[in-house]
């Protein structure tokens, strides 16, 4: 084995021992390979979209620089490695500058292996060498993610064009026309953060067991961590109870909520479908211009025009009043049932002046007055009267025994059980031992009458 071959083999073996398989890849030919270099960004590094100074994004990782190389037979004694540098977020001008810097490093170290020197420079000094600081400005439109101001110069006064900086053919810019560059950078940053998180150990805030991040869930807003087993059970209970707005961090007084993606990863398909449906419904409930079709077989969400009380269901085409949920009645006041009148009375009496005016406008002032009067009358009748079992007339018992005579149909009935009594012998109902009202003819009579009855007997 020649000295060059031995030096190359030793260098490649050293690189394979330093970097893992995801970072360093050696081709089967033995003299080619590539290495992926993720640069270490300073804390609080930001991305800034050109023309949108308010749209800054905090990131911790950028896609790697890729150094591809081919080692000639006479490397390192005579020839330099043949290489290319590719990047998704650097411009070709910037990559060209890196290529020329690697050429300079080869000139300084000619005759010696240089790959590790190149790698160290690219990994540790690229940002400083190119003058890249936070925020890093990127350009979303066009064929390239960033503008290249150094590539072009304005024409001088004589009309002659200034020299255009030559781009190195070894400088490769990876451009995916199908995906926005900002999306690519943010997705990569998120994936790398998740990878780092998965490899760390965390103490669950619920069961206090120590588990790897791959078995845990991180609430992104507050960064509290819980194991997936605990948080899954917590989510399932909340979804079962219909509390889809309460899938927040279990930490007391913490308002951070789980994302739908996190919920979907933990619960089953049926549970997530219920969660998704209830979440949509609760969101619609908060919208003032959304009501639901009153037909029980439909219940479709309906958009209501401003200053209108008519809703038309887009599914069943039912036209209804958005106030009383009955068929649309135009300018006529809403019609209320007896139970609704009672509720209307309570709402009206407890409302402010503005609330009372709204109810009067909705139902009509006469309807409101009738609701108040009739509901009070109904309450009094329910408290003090019973209905005749034969004709339904309300009967009040002021005094006397429990054998009652209806003032309307003249039928006899029992005040206790409301059973109809015999016209021939109505008192047999109270004298029969098998009757539920046996010996109850005078049950419930007022004490004054009892005492008076007793004193008459004594006389």
UniProtKB/Swiss-Prot annotation:
Keyword Ribosomal protein among record annotations: no
Highest taxon of source: Eukaryota
Binding site for Zn(2+) 6: 414, 417, 429, 437
Zinc finger intervals, IBR-type: 273-334
Binding site for Zn(2+) 2: 222, 224, 249, 254
Residues binding Zn(2+) 4: 321, 324, 329, 334
Zinc finger (RING-type): 204-249, 204-254, 388-417
Pathway membership, UniProt: Protein modification; protein ubiquitination
Annotated region (Disordered), positions in chain: 141-169
Main localization of the protein described in the UniProt heading: cytoplasm
Ranges of biased composition (kind: Basic and acidic residues): 150-169
Domain RWD stretches: 10-129
GO cellular component: cytoplasm; nucleus; ubiquitin ligase complex
Catalytic residues (UniProt): 401
Localization per record: Cytoplasm; Nucleus
Alphabetically ordered keywords of this record: Cytoplasm, Metal-binding, Nucleus, Repeat, Transcription, Transcription regulation, Transferase, Ubl conjugation pathway, Zinc, Zinc-finger
The EC number(s) this enzyme carries: 2.3.2.31
Enzymatic reactions: [E2 ubiquitin-conjugating enzyme]-S-ubiquitinyl-L-cysteine + [acceptor protein]-L-lysine = [E2 ubiquitin-conjugating enzyme]-L-cysteine + [acceptor protein]-N(6)-ubiquitinyl-L-lysine
List of residues binding Zn(2+) 5: 388, 391, 406, 409
Binding site for Zn(2+) 1: 204, 207, 227, 230
Similarity comment text for this entry: Belongs to the RBR family. RNF14 subfamily.
Biological function: E3 ubiquitin-protein ligase that plays a key role in the RNF14-RNF25 translation quality control pathway, a pathway that takes place when a ribosome has stalled during translation, and which promotes ubiquitination and degradation of translation factors on stalled ribosomes. Recruited to stalled ribosomes by the ribosome collision sensor GCN1 and mediates 'Lys-6'-linked ubiquitination of target proteins, leading to their degradation. Mediates ubiquitination of eef1a1/eEF1A and etf1/eRF1 translation factors on stalled ribosomes, leading to their degradation.
Stored PANTHER family: RBR FAMILY RING FINGER AND IBR DOMAIN-CONTAINING
Protein name (record): E3 ubiquitin-protein ligase RNF14
Organism in which the protein naturally occurs: Danio rerio
């Amino acid at each position: 084995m020649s000295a060059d071959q031995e030096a190359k083999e030793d260098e490649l073996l050293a690189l394979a021992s330093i970097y893992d398989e995801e970072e360093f890849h050696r081709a089967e030919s033995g003299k080619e390979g590539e290495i992926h270099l993720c640069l270490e960004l300073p804390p609080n590094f930001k991305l800034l979209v050109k023309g949108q100074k308010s749209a800054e994004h905090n990131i911790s990782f950028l896609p790697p620089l890729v150094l591809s190389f081919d080692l000639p037979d006479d490397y390192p004694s005579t020839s330099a490695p043949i290489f290319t540098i590719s990047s998704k977020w650097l411009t070709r001008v910037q990559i060209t500058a890196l290529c020329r810097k690697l050429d300079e490093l080869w000139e300084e170290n000619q005759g010696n292996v240089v790959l590790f020197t190149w790698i160290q420079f690219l990994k540790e000094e690229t940002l400083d060498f190119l003058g890249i600081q936070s925020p890093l400005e990127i350009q979303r439109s066009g064929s390239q993610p960033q503008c290249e101001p150094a590539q072009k110069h304005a024409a001088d006064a004589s009309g002659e064009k200034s020299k255009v900086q030559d781009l190195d053919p070894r400088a490769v810019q990876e451009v995916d026309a199908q995906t926005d560059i900002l999306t690519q950078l943010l997705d990569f940053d998120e994936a790398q953060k998740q990878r780092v998180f998965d490899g760390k150990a965390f103490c669950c805030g619920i069961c206090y067991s120590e588990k790897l991040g791959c078995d845990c869930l991180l609430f992104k807003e507050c960064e509290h961590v819980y194991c997936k087993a605990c948080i899954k059970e917590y989510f399932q209970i909340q979804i079962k109870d219909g509390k889809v707005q309460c899938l927040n961090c279990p930490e007391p007084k913490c308002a951070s909520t789980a994302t739908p993606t996190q919920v979907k990863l933990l619960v089953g398909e049926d549970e997530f479908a219920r969660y998704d449906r209830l979440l949509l419904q609760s969101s619609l409930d908060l919208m003032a211009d959304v009501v639901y079709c009153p037909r029980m077989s439909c219940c479709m969400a309906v958009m209501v025009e401003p200053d209108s009380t008519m809703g038309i269901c887009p599914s069943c085409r039912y036209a209804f009043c958005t106030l009383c949920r009955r068929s649309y009645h135009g300018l006529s006041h809403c019609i209320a049932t007896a139970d609704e009148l009672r509720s209307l009375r309570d709402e009206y009496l407890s409302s402010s002046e503005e609330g009372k005016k709204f109810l009067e406008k909705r139902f009509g002032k006469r309807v409101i007055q009738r609701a108040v009067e009739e509901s009070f009358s109904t309450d009094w009748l329910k408290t003090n009267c019973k209905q005749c079992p034969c004709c339904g007339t309300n009967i009040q018992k002021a005094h006397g025994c429990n054998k009652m005579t209806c003032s309307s149909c003249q039928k006899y009935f029992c005040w206790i059980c409301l059973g109809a009594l015999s016209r021939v012998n109505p008192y047999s109902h109270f004298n029969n031992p098998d009757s539920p009202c046996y010996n109850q003819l005078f049950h419930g009579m007022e004490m004054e009458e009892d005492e008076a009855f007793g004193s008459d007997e004594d006389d």
